[in-house]
Amino acid sequence: MQALVTGGAGFVGTNLIKRLLKEGHKVISLDNYSTGKKENEQDGCKYYELDLSSKSSLGSLDSISVVNQISKFDVIFHLAAKARIVPSIQNPKKSLFNNINSTINILEFVRKNNTPVVYAGSSSSHGDIYANPYTFTKWNGEELCKLYSNVYNLPTTICRFYNVYGDHQLTDGAYCTVLGVFERLHQMGNKEETLHMLVIS
């Protein structure tokens, strides 16, 4: 199988690529390296630095396919996004522009050859989608996938991730996960509330 992974140098993308390579699949990664890291790159995967939200990304995707002699990817895992709620509140334009346009460009690319797309949604979409720009963009991405599936019969799958943690997660900077730096959590409420966590490995 020939797979394309967007956000392949990030936390979830790195773990996915490791699994795909282990199973013997061919993998190409696209990442703008805004949060993805070069040290996450895996032997056996081809990495391309590309801003999927830019107008030129569709032409770049076509060029990558030609260079690698790929007439059609078997599946595209669209993980790339400006993640986290607080940064999206601080810079809404950046999150809105990047997350929405990159999803549109991926869907336009695959519309030509009906490639299945797996979209990385967010559990935050279960709540108030207008609570913050990040949640809105992830919900919007789901709706775009549904639109292209309905109008163009494009095979799409939406995965809503819940509080992910594991190998290759961000452990530095202002917005790293609490688990990543092993900070003790202060439990609030009646101490009977639960939080769903998803291990990525």
Tell me the role of every PLM-derived stretch.
Residues 1-164:
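N-terminal Rossmann-like NAD(P)+-binding domain of SDR-like oxidoreductases, especially those catalyzing
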Residues 133-135, 139, 143-201:
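NAD(P)-dependent short-chain dehydrogenase/reductase
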